[in-house]
Design a protein with these regions (language model features):
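Short linear motifs at protein or domain termini
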Residues: 1-99, 103, 109, 113
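Juxtamembrane/interface motifs at transmembrane-helix termini
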Residues: 3, 48, 115-117, 142-143, ...
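Solvent-exposed, non-membrane alpha-helical residues enriched in polar/charged side chains
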Residues: 16, 20-21, 151, 199, ...
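Short loop-to-helix capping motifs
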Residues: 32, 155-157, 205-207
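All-alpha effector-binding/dimerization core of bacterial HTH-type transcriptional repressors
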Residues: 73-149, 186-212
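Cytosolic histidine kinase catalytic core of two-component systems
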Residues: 118, 157-158
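C-terminal all-alpha effector/ligand-binding and dimerization domain
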Residues: 131, 169-233
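Short, charge-rich, low-complexity alpha-helical interaction segments
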Residues: 160-170
Length: 233
């Protein structure tokens, strides 16, 4: 058993080195299990275990009938870790919200320098759609996309991955949170004012204005969620 454990770790280390040396890039297909086993002189069970772990951690994607591909989607394993921590009461929503706020503030600062005109225009369009839409489900999707676009426009993949992981935890455990926040016209109006000021600040490259808009945005969300929790007591 111990020998097999060392063998699958050796397979993982082999592919890790290949990736670090630039010999394997995202999108490239791994050789068949049999070829890997023969090349590394290990059992196919060890190769399968290594592939299973690399799939779980986001290094590869196993596609049935097609094979295994390098993806390096580490956000996947990060989201799974945070989801388990939330499920086991190791973290709560307030802690996730604190991280989200800090990262979105950082994302905004970076977006001032890195956001393209096209990205800013797309975020403006999302804010306008939110203003007009009366569909709760659509509003929740638009809000999620807007915050994703802000993270993406930061140009920092770690900021994007961490924020996506936070969003995944929220979607897993507080299914209707976004819809509830945007359900009343007054709340929707207040939050969308924050969105508008945020995009205006991005266009104007106004750091202070943008940070104030984000601070107000998270204050409103946390107030709403506190009310929600109090109703459960």
């Amino acid at each position: 058993m111990e020998k097999q454990q060392k063998a699958y770790k050796g397979v993982i280390d082999y592919f890790k080195k290949k990736i670090m040396d630039g010999e394997l890039r995202p999108g490239e297909k791994l050789p068949p299990e049999r070829d890997i086993a023969e090349q590394l002189n290990v059992s196919r069970n060890s190769v399968r275990e290594a592939i299973r772990i690399m799939d779980m951690t986001g290094v590869i994607s196993s596609q049935q009938g097609s094979g295994n591909y390098i993806t390096c989607e580490f956000q996947k394993s990060l989201a799974e870790t945070m989801t388990m921590m939330f499920a086991m009461d190791q973290i709560d929503y307030s802690q996730i919200s604190q991280i989200r706020q800090a990262l979105e503030c950082l994302a905004f600062s970076l977006a001032i320098e890195h956001a393209s005109d096209g990205q800013i225009e797309e975020m403006e369009m999302l804010v306008k759609e939110l203003d007009k839409s009366t569909d709760d489900v659509k509003n929740a999707a638009l809000d999620k996309k807007l915050h994703f676009m802000l993270a993406q426009s930061s140009g920092n993949i770690l900021v994007l991955d961490f924020l996506e992981a936070c969003s995944g935890v929220i979607d897993s455990f507080i299914h209707d949170m976004r819809a509830e926040i945007l359900r009343t016209e007054e709340r929707k109006k207040l939050l969308n004012e924050c969105h508008k000021k945020l995009i205006e600040a991005l266009k104007e490259k106004d750091e202070t204005k943008g940070q104030e808009a984000l601070k107000r945005h998270f204050m409103l969300i946390n107030e709403i969620l506190e009310e929600r929790e109090n109703r459960k007591i």
